[in-house]
């Protein structure tokens, strides 16, 4: 069982690396089995992809589940640290953005893979519902700060995808991650939510 877990781990990490580096065209069965990493006293073979995952597409899905779970827990920690968004919404959302942004920029390879899968036919066909269910808790935590008519899930989806778009530009050297640019990036994301946020209660 330990060896099986090690083989699965190696294949998942290979998938993440290859998809991040060159997309799904790069992540062939041969490359998935042999691109990097090794286990002592063991010779990797493509057959293990089919034995443990059924297909390379199922391996792609397993890699996304790994990354989606990592992202969820990073966001969940941010929500728990802030402890609610009802008061001082913009300030607290800014703190949440800072934590999320730091996580995304600190995990370039994993986030490149995440984005490539997220915009692929594999996500639409295999992972969308599981992703929505996983992030229900984050949506629920943020729902109280939005107006009743707001589609909170759709708004947060737009904000998070925009954040990843900015991150890709940083990875590619098109945008500098700086003290000057960071507030501007947050303001763009905040403006995507502002119309739908509840007004703060006025002091009597």
Model region roles, listed by residue range:
Residues 1-6, 200-204:
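N-terminal intrinsically disordered/low-complexity leader segments
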Residues 7-16, 32, 63-67, 71-75:
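Generic hydrophobic, amphipathic alpha-helix propensity
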Residues 69-77, 122-147, 153-157, 183:
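Amphipathic alpha-helical packing segments from all-alpha helical-bundle domains
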Residues 78-85, 111-122, 170-174:
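Secondary-structure edge/capping motif, primarily at the C-terminal ends of alpha-helices
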Residues 62, 66, 76-106, 155, ...:
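Hydrophobic alpha-helical connector segments
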Residues 10, 18-58, 62:
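Helix-turn-helix
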Residues 112-116, 132, 143-190, 200-204:
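Hydrophobic/aromatic-rich alpha-helical bundle segments in the mid-to-C-terminal region
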Residues 58, 101-140:
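Short secondary-structure transition hinges
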């Amino acid at each position: 069982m330990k060896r099986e877990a090690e083989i699965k781990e190696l294949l998942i990490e290979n998938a993440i690396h290859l998809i991040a580096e060159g997309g799904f065209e790069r992540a062939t069965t041969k490359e998935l089995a042999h691109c990097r990493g090794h286990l002592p006293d063991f010779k990797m073979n493509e057959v293990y992809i089919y034995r443990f995952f059924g297909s390379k597409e199922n391996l792609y899905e397993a890699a996304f589940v790994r990354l989606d779970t990592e992202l969820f827990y990073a966001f969940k920690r941010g929500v728990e640290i802030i402890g609610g968004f009802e008061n001082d919404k913009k300030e607290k959302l800014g703190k949440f953005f800072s934590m999320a942004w730091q996580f995304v920029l600190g995990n370039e390879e994993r986030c490149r893979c995440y984005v490539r899968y997220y915009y692929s036919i594999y996500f639409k066909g295999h992972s969308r519902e599981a992703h929505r269910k996983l992030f229900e808790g984050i949506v629920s935590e943020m729902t109280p700060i939005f107006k009743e008519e707001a589609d909170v899930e759709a708004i947060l989806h737009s904000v998070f995808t925009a954040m990843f778009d900015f991150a890709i530009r940083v990875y590619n050297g098109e945008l500098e991650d700086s003290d000057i640019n960071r507030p501007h990036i947050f303001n763009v994301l905040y403006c995507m939510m502002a119309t739908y946020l509840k007004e703060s209660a006025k002091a009597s």
